[in-house]
Amino acid sequence: MKQYDIIVVGTGGATIVADAAIKVGKKVAIIEKGKFGGTCLTRGCIPTKVMVTAANAIQEVEEFKKIGVNVGDATMDWDTVAKRTWHMIDKSAGIYDYYNAYDNVDVYRGAASFVSDKVMNIH
């Protein structure tokens, strides 16, 4: 059975803890059952921001017309927006490579559950 100083379940916001532990030489386990990056990167904040940015740009074009700047009618190319969104999500693969490069980090794929107060199971 492997021993760790820190076990981080999920690769969302808790990776801040993993980063701090890695920097001071602690033995770290990271457990992720889904895409690396957590909810924010994969289906929350980042995808939403890509879509909101596109929508804001359309609105800005409409505002330009009010001050005499005419750039034509703005339209949304949903295929391009979707590609950009997936590009941002796919960058999460780099998070796995980042952590896997450290000798003091073990990355596990799966769900974690406690067996006892100091023992975890990955399934």
Place the predicted regions along the sequence by residue.
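Glycine-rich flavin
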Residues: 2-4, 19-26, 31-123
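N-terminal Rossmann-fold NAD(P) dinucleotide-binding loop
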Residues: 14-17
